[in-house]
Swiss-Prot record:
Comp. bias (Polar residues): 804-813
Protein's name in the database: Probable receptor-like protein kinase At5g39020
Transmembrane stretches, start-end: 438-458
Source species: Arabidopsis thaliana
Active site: 619 (proton acceptor)
Ranges where the record places region Disordered: 791-813
Positions annotated with a glycan in the UniProt record: 46, 61, 165, 202, 213, 263, 286, 293, 384, 401
Places the protein is found: Membrane
Keyword Transcription regulation: no
Length: 813
């Protein structure tokens, strides 16, 4: 009995140790090529000299060694300062354990003391029948590296039996070189069996992809998402280097729980990825709750190959502990790779890591030799999850060899021959006495270069035209993947043949409808006018990238022939404009007004700063703010919105966007400054003045024939303490302070010069802060004419034109 117990305990201990322990490779070789003594690098790893048993017999004639002339920043002495340089084809032969191995080649393209300049070195590399590099130039590869570096490591995964034969072949009349060679064994079928679930999903087919044991790989990208660089010695036993994803444009918030324990399992043992990868993650939005952002990760690859995409996940946030709290879809190259990814459900619980494998072919459709592979993680909107977000811990991208055993990218158009081995006897001496031959050669070469340049320019123009033509179709394809698409007949059924009109605008009519599950929705049908496709794309693109308590939720769309419609949540209390109209004769609830103003500000702050791609609305007005049952405001109608990078301070518009009375002056005339997200700030200020009654007094003053510029009388009333035009006599002192704060914030928002206006994140701080912290801004003095606005403006709601024109000189600053 005791023996059985001891046996079971020993088995349990061995299994647990296998799960939690790092990998211990059977083969580890580190060769400092060209060096004469063994050395230790900065990380403590031992590099040895090349053994004569693994060198070709023609060592002296085929190669020589040299030392780099100088050591550039970031370049370690071992293994980069010494190199073996090859005059002719040269083969290393390594005895290895059967299986698959990591082969890492180290290059430092610089000048060497022997006179060799590695910048001008072109060569090919083969191993056991696989072509790893062809006509390879280390310097150009280093120059294009992300992040920038002065040295280079090329990593390959090679199937081996007992011997690894590594051959370097210089291009004709040139030299080849290498600084270091590393060989490390790996677990059996580590990259070919699939993810933690032993499945390798093919994103282009319903049939799973298969990788046999004879496949070679090149490691293209290995990223620690949300974390720092993980150096070789900190890996899980295979000496891989994990780069930070900071250089790849990711802006989602980082998850880093100090001291979190990662619970490795038999399906995901500790050697799959190191602790530092699973302990940090990046949320694809900027908040852990009620926010969503479609985040694209773009990773440069070589066209014409299949790729293995391995994604690592681990839920470490203490509040995410149950299945269903965070669910998202995975898209690779705009194709649905996995619809529902619930890390808690798939892995078995919190702090349990997992990894998924996908295969995708990247062709030449883009016209580029090195296109970008796109990866998107998209939260599912139609689930009752707590956190509308997506999470990612690590990414590995590996290229598979083609049918010819090739991993090298297509040859660049270089005036260098690669077809034979250099030999002095084969070099043709210059022809004396025949200068015309040189002239002919120069003419031919010049013509070829000119023709090639012309062809490249034409190809670029064609590709640009093709992209512009297909931009709308590609956007709609993406919408189909992310949202529910309705046919027009379904819209008629949902709206009961469009019988209940909620509102009308310049771009379409909004109807009330009911889905089959009983949910009430708003159906906005765009007018059948030429050019409305752009408005549709604008609105769906903008709304599909948002999920915030103060932004209207997009539920679906219709894109059928000339029919365009948007299906969104329905809000019972209608628009802010209707709310203001209903309460004109009543003393308003200041707390409600304040809550609405603050909610709108937060929604705009999210559009400007919470999305990976900034969204500028360009049509903020009461009609485009909807109120739910609790008077929570939601920004709606994104037909005029523009998406831009956050670093873009000035936007380019070919038309005037907005509604008279709310358009920022710089949108109408560039004499006021550049167009930016500050244009929304101006519209917000005008909207808040509407809410507190200031715009009503403008109309009264104008109708009485006064030419007073309304900020002037607001300043005067504030100085005299006269605010009865806003709040009446029944307001208490506390509400009086709130209203005054809203006025001051509005006055700052409607400054004529955009640079004088606060950004929306500052506006939120001002509204939430103390009245004592706010100062009265200087009086504005610049006006804009009614005629100028009417001539240049594209109204978002044509029915307001007449009303707004009456007060234009008073309301546009």
């Amino acid at each position: 009995m005791n023996c059985n117990v001891l046996f079971l305990l020993s088995v349990l201990v061995s299994v647990t140790a296998g799960v939690t322990a790092a990998y211990h490779p059977t083969d580890v070789f580190l060769f400092n090529c060209g060096d004469t003594s063994n050395n230790v690098d900065n990380s403590g790893r031992n590099w040895t000299v090349e053994s004569r048993q693994i060198l070709s017999s023609n060592l002296v004639n085929a190669s020589f060694t040299s030392e780099a002339s100088y050591q550039k920043a970031g370049v370690s002495r071992i293994p980069y300062m010494k190199a073996r340089i090859f005059r002719s084809e040269f083969t290393y032969s390594f005895p290895v354990t059967p299986g698959s191995i990591f082969l890492r080649l180290y290059f430092y393209p610089t000048q060497y003391k022997s006179g060799f300049d590695a910048v001008n070195s072109f060569f090919s590399v083969k191993v056991n029948g696989f072509t790893l590099l062809r006509n390879f130039n280390a310097d150009s590869t280093v120059q294009a590296s992300i992040p920038l570096s002065n040295s280079l490591i090329k990593e390959f995964i090679i199937p081996v039996h007992q011997t690894l034969n590594l051959t370097f072949t210089p291009s004709k009349n040139l030299l080849a070189f290498v600084n270091g060679i590393e060989i490390v064994s790996m677990p059996d079928r580590f990259y070919s069996k699939g993810g933690f679930d032993n499945v390798l999903r093919n994103v282009s087919s319903d049939v799973d992809f298969q990788i046999d044991n004879s496949t070679a790989f090149e490691s293209v990208h290995r990223l620690n998402v949300g974390g720092q660089i993980v150096n070789e010695v900190d890996d899980s036993g295979m000496f891989r280097r994990w780069l930070s994803d900071d250089s790849f444009g990711n802006s989602g918030s980082i998850v880093n729980v100090p001291g979190v324990k990662i619970n490795y399992t038999e399906k995901t043992p500790a050697y799959v990825a190191p602790y530092d990868v699973y302990a940090t993650s990046r949320l694809m939005g900027n908040s852990s709750n009620l926010m969503f952002n479609l985040t694209g990760m773009f990773l440069t690859v070589d066209a014409g190959y299949n790729y293995l995409v391995r994604l690592h996940f681990c839920e470490t946030l203490p509040q995410v502990t149950k299945a269903g709290q965070r669910v998202f879809s995975i898209f690779v190259e705009d194709k649905m790779a996995k619809k529902e990814t619930d890390v808690i459900r798939l892995s078995g619980g919190p702090r349990i890591p997992m990894y998924l494998d996908f295969s995708v072919y990247v062709g030449f459709e883009s016209g580029m030799i090195q296109p970008e592979l796109r990866l998107d993680l998209v939260p599912l909107k139609d689930t009752n999850q707590t956190y509308y977000d997506a999470i990612l811990s690590g990414v590995e991208i590996l290229k598979l060899n083609d049918s010819d055993g090739n991993l090298a990218r297509p040859n660049p158009e270089l005036l260098v021959s690669t077809d034979s081995t250099p030999d002095d006897s084969n070099v043709t001496p210059p022809i004396k006495g025949k200068p015309h031959v040189l002239v002919i050669i120069l003419i031919v070469v010049g013509s070829v270069i000119g023709l090639a340049t012309f062809i490249v320019i034409i190809m670029l123009l064609i590709r640009q035209m093709k992209r512009k033509k297909n931009k709308k179709e590609n956007s709609v394809i993406m919408f189909k993947l992310l949202l529910k698409q309705y046919i027009y007949a379904e819209l008629k059924k949902i709206t009961k043949s469009f019988s209940h009109t909620v509102g009308k605008g310049g771009f379409g009519t909004v109807y009330r409808g009911n889905l089959s599950n009983g949910r009430t929705v708003a159906v906005k049908v765009l007018k059948d006018l030429k050019g409305n496709g752009d408005d549709f794309i604008n609105e769906v693109t903008s709304m599909s990238q948002t999920s915030h308590v103060n932004i209207v939720s997009l539920l679906g769309f219709c894109y059928e022939g000339s029919k365009r419609a948007i299906i969104s949540e329905f809000l019972e209390h209608g628009s802010l404009d209707q709310f203001i109209s209903r309460n004109k004769s009543l003393t308003p609830n200041v707390t409600t007004l304040y809550g609405i103003a603050l909610g709108i500000a937060r929604g705009l702050e999210y559009l400007h700063y919470g999305c990976k791609t900034r969204i500028v609305h360009f049509d903020i007005k009461p009609q485009n703010i909807l109120l739910d049952d609790n008077f929570c405001p939601k920004v709606a109608d994104f037909g005029l919105a523009k998406l831009c990078e956050k670093r873009e301070s000035i936007l380019s518009l070919i038309d005037t966007r907005g509604t008279i009375g709310y358009i920022a002056p710089e949108v109408v005339s560039r004499m006021y400054g550049g167009i930016s997200h500050k244009s929304d700030v101006y519209s917000y200020g005008m909207l808040v003045l509407d809410m507190i009654g200031a715009r009503n007094k403008v109309e009264t003053t104008t109708c009485n024939g006064s030419t007073a510029y309304f900020p002037d009388w607001i300043y005067k009333d504030l100085e005299n303490g006269d605010q009865t035009w806003i709040i009446g006599d029944e307001i208490n002192e506390e509400d009086n302070k709130i209203v005054k704060k809203m006025i001051l914030v509005s006055l700052w928002c409607i400054r004529p010069c955009p640079s004088d206006r606060p950004p929306m994140n500052k506006v939120v701080e001002m509204i939430e802060g103390s009245l004592d912290a706010l100062e009265l801004p200087p009086k504005p003095s610049r006006h804009i004419s009614t005629e100028l606005v009417l001539e240049s403006s594209s109204l978002s709601d044509g029915q307001e034109a007449e009303k707004q024109t009456q007060t234009l000189d008073s309301t546009i600053i």
